[in-house]
A protein has these predicted regions:
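"…together with the soluble PPM/PP2C metallo-phosphatase catalytic core" -> "…together
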Residues: 1-180
């Protein structure tokens, strides 16, 4: 439903002339297909939060709500990037520095919210040794790099054809496993 709609609205990707010739055949591949992932994330997360609130009360849901907000805000950065590409009728949206700055702001707000709600501390558990290492303020620097690195991992793996669903499933399974 979404891909045909994007094609009819001519929301296709422009291809730069600097790459291999076969890339030109991918011109017109719909952009903003990430909206489907954002919608799926929103629906499943909302259902999950509703179950957790019903079972444990609202106290246990703040981390989930903040993490959902993190995902949606990063999705919004991607949508904004695609809108810039579309409005300028070129393949270049936000500059990398602009996009990374927005991702840092989003991650920083997430970490601030998690810290203020008591969902994280500055301690890092070292497995197999069984000790906690208090990183202090450095914890947030490391966490910012980890969050933005994870956010960009799928983006960098996305090819010319925009078929990022396989990578997204792998990353989603990882996050599901880590969250439990």
């Amino acid at each position: 439903f979404l891909i045909p709609a994007l094609k009819s609205w001519k929301m296709g990707q422009k291809i730069l002339d600097i790459g291999p010739r076969w890339h030109k055949s991918k011109e017109g591949t719909p952009t903003m297909g990430g909206l489907a992932f954002i919608a799926a994330c929103l629906v499943t997360s909302t259902i999950t939060v509703a179950f957790i609130v019903a079972l444990d009360g609202p106290a246990g849901s703040s981390a989930l709500i903040l993490t959902l907000a993190l995902a949606l805000a990063n999705g919004a950065v991607g949508v904004f990037d695609d809108l810039v590409k579309f409005s300028h009728k070129r393949n270049e949206g936000l500059r990398a520095s602009q996009k990374y700055f927005l991702q840092l702001v989003v991650a920083g707000l997430y970490l601030f919210g998690m810290y203020m709600t008591g969902n994280i501390t500055t301690e890092l558990y070292i497995p197999f040794v069984g000790i906690f290492l208090d990183l202090g303020i450095f914890y947030f620097v490391v966490a910012l790099l980890v969050i933005t690195g994870i956010v960009n991992s799928v983006n960098l793996a996305d090819g010319v054809d925009g078929l990022v669903s396989c990578e997204t499933v792998v990353v989603g399974i990882f996050f599901a496993a880590v969250s439990f």
